[in-house]
UniProtKB/Swiss-Prot annotation:
InterPro entries: MATH/TRAF_dom, TRAF-like, Znf_RING/FYVE/PHD, Znf_TRAF. The MATH/TRAF domain binds to receptor cytoplasmic domains. Residues 456-584 form the MATH domain. It comes from Dictyostelium discoideum. This is TNF receptor-associated factor family protein DDB_G0272348. Pfam families: MATH_2, zf-TRAF.
Length: 595
C-alpha cells in the first residue's frame, strides 16, 4: 500500500542525532505529562510503615500508567486526521506515546515511515528488513527519525487527561471534568495550571501517621473541590470549641468525653455545672451534697453524712466527746512511740560516733607509723648514697694519683729519650761535619700520646627566679650557666626547662667552648633535694671533647620530669630556685709532636 506524501518532505538523518533533536522539540510534552502525574501522586496511606511503602510504589505505578496513555485516546476528531499519519499495519497513529523516547516517527534509509514504532519492533523480531521496500534494517537504532512528521504530531489537538473520570476507561466527565482542548506541545503548561486533576486527601495522610488509629481512606477528588471535601472529611483538623486544642473531627466526641478539661459538666451530687478540671476539687472540699465521713472517724465515729449536715451531726448528743478522747489517746501513744524511737536512734548515733573516733585515732597512728618508716628508709638511702659517693670519690682520687704517677713516669722517659736523641744527633753532626750535611730531626710519639695531670672541679649552679627564667627560656629553649675553667679548657652547662626532645622532661648538658684542645672528662651532675625524699636525680658520664665534636653537649635529655620538678612536695624547687651540683675530673690530652 502506498500513500502520496503531498507537502511532506522526507529527511533522513542518523537515529541518534534526530532522537536528540526530537527529544528537545518535544520536551514540553514529556514534562507536562510528568507534572500531570505529580498532581495525582498521593495515594492511600495506612497507619503502618509497610503500607506507606506500598502506597509510594503505587504512586510511581500511577505515574507510569499516565505516561502510557496512548495519544489516540486523547486526540480530538481522530476520524478527520489524514490516513498518512496512521500505521499501515495496526491502523493506529504513527506516534502514539507521550514517552520522550517513543514520541517519534521512524523510517528506513529509503524514507518509508508508514509503520509505527511498536509494529517496527515486532517486525524486526522476525525479519531484518523494511516492511515496505525490503531494504535491510539491522535494528531499531539503525532507523532514522522523520522530524516533519514528528513535529506535525506536536500540533495535534487533544483533550486534557483531567476531562475523564479516570485514565482506564476514558469515560468523559461532562460535569466536573476539564473542558480544555489543547495541542500536544501545550500539555505541560496546561497541566501546571489545571485545577481538575485528582489529588489524595492530605488529612488522611496525616491521620494515618498517628498511632493506634484505624480509618477508611477518602476517595481522590479534584483540586478545585478541596474546600468542599474538607467540609465533609472526617479527618480534617479542627479547633476544640472549649480548650482550643487541635484535633481531628472524627475524634471530637472522644476528646470531649476523655481529654478536654475545659468542657462544662454537672456535679453528680449537687447537679451544678463546673469545668471538668474543677469538678474533683469541688467534690472533695466544697460540694454540700457529697457524702463524707465524720471528722472524728479515727476516734470511732463511723457515721457517713452529707457535708451540709456535718455541723448538725456534731451537735447531736455528747458521744463525740468520747471520740475526741480516743483520738487524743491515740496521739499520746504515737508521741510515746516516736520518743522511744528517737532515744534508740540517739543511742545508735552515739555508738557510731564513738566507732568513728576510734577509727580516726587508729588511722592517725598507722599514718604516723608509715611516715616514720618512710623517713627512716630515706635516711638509710641517703646514708648509702653518701657512702657510695665517698667510695667513688676515693676510687677517683686513687685513679687520679695513679694517672699522675704514670704521667710523671712517662715524662721522665720522654726526657731521657730526648736527651739520648740529642746525644746521637750531636755525634752524627760531628761525624758528618766534613761533608757539611745536617740530618733532619723527627720527634717520635711519646707513650700514649702524652698527657697533663688530671684537674678536678667541684661547684654548685643555683638558678634563682626559676619561673621567670623558665618563661624567658621559651624563646631560646634553654638557661645557660656562667663559664668555668678546668685546666686550659672552658666549660658551661645548659638547662632545658621544656626538654630538648620531650616537652614533659627537663634536660641538662655539659658543653665545652670550641678550641683545638682535646680533653677527656668524667662528669657527675646531681639535682639537689632540699627535703627527705626518695627521688634522686643524677647523671654520670665520661666523654672526650676534641676539635671534631667540640661543640657537642653531653648529659641527659630526660633528666627529670617537669611535673616532678615543679611539685613543691618533692623538695627540688625551693623559694623559686633549684640547685645543681657538678663534679668534673678532666684530663687534657697532648698530641705528639710531628715534623
Amino acid at each position: 500500500m502506498e500513500f502520496e506524501l503531498e507537502d511532506i518532505t522526507i529527511e533522513q538523518s542518523s537515529f541518534t542525532n534526530n532522537n536528540s533533536n526530537n527529544n528537545n522539540n518535544n520536551n514540553n510534552n514529556s514534562n507536562s505529562n510528568n507534572n500531570n502525574n505529580n498532581n495525582n501522586n498521593n495515594i492511600n496511606n495506612n497507619n503502618n510503615h509497610n503500607n506507606n511503602n506500598k502506597n509510594n510504589s503505587n504512586n510511581k505505578n500511577e505515574i507510569n500508567n499516565q505516561l502510557d496513555i496512548p495519544i489516540s485516546n486523547l486526540v480530538v476528531d481522530k476520524e478527520n486526521i489524514s490516513k498518512k499519519y496512521f500505521c499501515t499495519i495496526c491502523s493506529d497513529l504513527l506516534v502514539n506515546s507521550f514517552h520522550a523516547d517513543k514520541f517519534k516517527a521512524v523510517q528506513c534509509k529509503n524514507g518509508h515511515y508508514t509503520t509505527c514504532l511498536n509494529c517496527w519492533e515486532k517486525h524486526l523480531e522476525k525479519k531484518k528488513n523494511c516492511i515496505q521496500c525490503g531494504v535491510d534494517v539491522e535494528s531499531i537504532e539503525s532507523l532514522s527519525s522523520n522530524l516533519l512528521v514528528t513535529q506535525k504530531f506536536t500540533t495535534f489537538k487533544i483533550h486534557c487527561p483531567n476531562s475523564f473520570f479516570d485514565t482506564i476507561d476514558f469515560i468523559k466527565d461532562e460535569v466536573n471534568g476539564c473542558k480544555e482542548i489543547i495541542q500536544i506541545n501545550e500539555l505541560e503548561e496546561h497541566l501546571k495550571e489545571c485545577q481538575y486533576g485528582f489529588i489524595s486527601c492530605k488529612n488522611c495522610e496525616e491521620f494515618s501517621k498517628l498511632p493506634f488509629q484505624e480509618f477508611t481512606q477518602c476517595p481522590d477528588f479534584r483540586k478545585n473541590t478541596k474546600e468542599q471535601h474538607d467540609l465533609i472529611c472526617p479527618y480534617v483538623k479542627i479547633s476544640c470549641e472549649y480548650c482550643g486544642d487541635i484535633i481531628n473531627k472524627i475524634n471530637k466526641e472522644s476528646h470531649n468525653a476523655n481529654w478536654c478539661q475545659e468542657i462544662t459538666i454537672k456535679c453528680l451530687d449537687c447537679h451544678l455545672p463546673f469545668k471538668k478540671k474543677e469538678i474533683n476539687q469541688h467534690q472533695k472540699s466544697f460540694c454540700p451534697e457529697t457524702i463524707i465521713q465524720c471528722r472524728y472517724s479515727k476516734g470511732g465515729c463511723n457515721a457517713m453524712i452529707r457535708r451540709s449536715k456535718l455541723s448538725q451531726h456534731l451537735t447531736e448528743g455528747d458521744n463525740h466527746h468520747q471520740f475526741i478522747s480516743n483520738i487524743l489517746n491515740q496521739q499520746d501513744l504515737k508521741i510515746n512511740e516516736l520518743e522511744l524511737k528517737n532515744t534508740e536512734f540517739c543511742l545508735l548515733l552515739n555508738g557510731q560516733n564513738k566507732k568513728i573516733t576510734e577509727l580516726e585515732i587508729l588511722f592517725k597512728e598507722l599514718n604516723d607509723s608509715i611516715l616514720i618508716q618512710k623517713q627512716q628508709q630515706k635516711q638509710q638511702q641517703q646514708q648509702q648514697q653518701q657512702q657510695q659517693q665517698q667510695q667513688q670519690q676515693q676510687q677517683q682520687q686513687q685513679q687520679s694519683q695513679q694517672q699522675q704517677s704514670q704521667q710523671q713516669q712517662q715524662s721522665q722517659q720522654q726526657q731521657q729519650s730526648q736527651q739520648s736523641q740529642q746525644n746521637n744527633n750531636s755525634n752524627s753532626h760531628f761525624i758528618n761535619n766534613n761533608n757539611n750535611n745536617i740530618n733532619n730531626v723527627q720527634m717520635s710519639d711519646s707513650p700514649n700520646g702524652g698527657s697533663l695531670p688530671q684537674a678536678v672541679y667541684k661547684n654548685k649552679w643555683v638558678i634563682s627566679n626559676y619561673s621567670e627564667q623558665e618563661q624567658q627560656g621559651i624563646s631560646k629553649d634553654y638557661i645557660k650557666s656562667p663559664l668555668f675553667k678546668i685546666g686550659n679548657s672552658t666549660f658551661f652547662l645548659k638547662w632545658f626547662p621544656f626538654g630538648k626532645k620531650k616537652l614533659n622532661y627537663c634536660s641538662i648538658f655539659l658543653y665545652k667552648t670550641q678550641d683545638d684542645k682535646s680533653i677527656i672528662v668524667n662528669y657527675y651532675i646531681h639535682l639537689v633535694n632540699n627535703q627527705i625524699s626518695d627521688e634522686v636525680y643524677e647523671k654520670r658520664g665520661c666523654q672526650k671533647y676534641d676539635s671534631e665534636n667540640g661543640s657537642a653537649g653531653y648529659g641527659s635529655s630526660q633528666f627529670i620530669k617537669r611535673a616532678d620538678l615543679l611539685n613543691d612536695a618533692n623538695g627540688f624547687l625551693i623559694n623559686d630556685s633549684i640547685t645543681i651540683e657538678i663534679e668534673i675530673f678532666a684530663t687534657e690530652e697532648i698530641l705528639p709532636l710531628q715534623s
